[in-house]
Design a protein with these regions (language model features):
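Short acidic-hydrophobic surface loop/beta-edge motif
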Residues: 1-3
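Short, surface-exposed, charged amphipathic helix/loop patches that serve as local interaction elements
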Residues: 15-191
Length: 191
């Protein structure tokens, strides 16, 4: 986000929600791949494709429309995770983060809808393989961990402090040099 580094943790939709929306999810998934969009642009445009197909079928708007049922459920199942200096990580439900302007709907909706299409249409093995390709292009990760387990798997937050050592000016590392790890600090995301 513009306010700092953060991640979205999303949970797949339930079988009941899939049964209610299988047709529109299948049409969206098929359209992404039959139009040659695939994993390159699919995560960016999946929500737009869902909206177009749903609108063409006159099922996008309204109380029982796809926007108010499926899309709201996808958002409900997602959380924004951000680092807090001295505390570790904190979360806020994605719908609240959207309401507060911490993240923009258009910045997250495509990837969330794409993930939902992929994870609900395919077998777990197919989903894993497809999302592995997506993660390389879109800097995302797929995991079966719950939100709490996933946060626990993140690196421990440590303030950047001087070690007293002189920084190396070499641009190359030797094979005996341990790789340096990135230090994660506060994302300064207001909640």
């Amino acid at each position: 986000t513009e306010k700092g580094k953060a991640w979205i943790h999303a949970t797949p939709i339930s079988k009941e929600v899939f049964k209610e929306h299988f047709f529109i999810l299948s049409k969206t998934f098929s359209a992404i791949f039959s139009e040659g969009l695939g994993v390159v642009s699919g995560p960016r445009i999946a929500c737009l494709m869902l909206e177009r197909i749903s609108s063409d079928m006159n099922i996008w708007d309204g109380e029982k429309g796809v926007r108010n049922t499926l899309v709201n459920e996808i958002i409900r199942l997602a959380n924004l995770v951000y680092p807090v200096e001295g505390k570790g990580y904190d979360t806020i439900p994605l719908d609240m983060a959207l309401e507060r302007g911490i993240v923009e709907f258009d910045d997250v909706a495509g990837e969330l809808v794409f993930f939902t299409c992929v994870s609900s249409i395919n077998t777990p093995e197919q989903t894993e393989q497809m999302m592995l390709v997506v993660s390389g292009m879109w800097n995302s990760r797929t995991s079966s961990l719950s939100l709490t387990e996933w946060i626990a798997s993140l690196p421990t937050l440590k303030p950047v402090a001087s070690s007293g050592a002189t920084a190396s000016t070499l641009s190359a590392t030797s094979s005996t040099t341990q790789p340096e790890t990135d230090s994660v600090t506060s994302g300064q995301i207001p909640v």
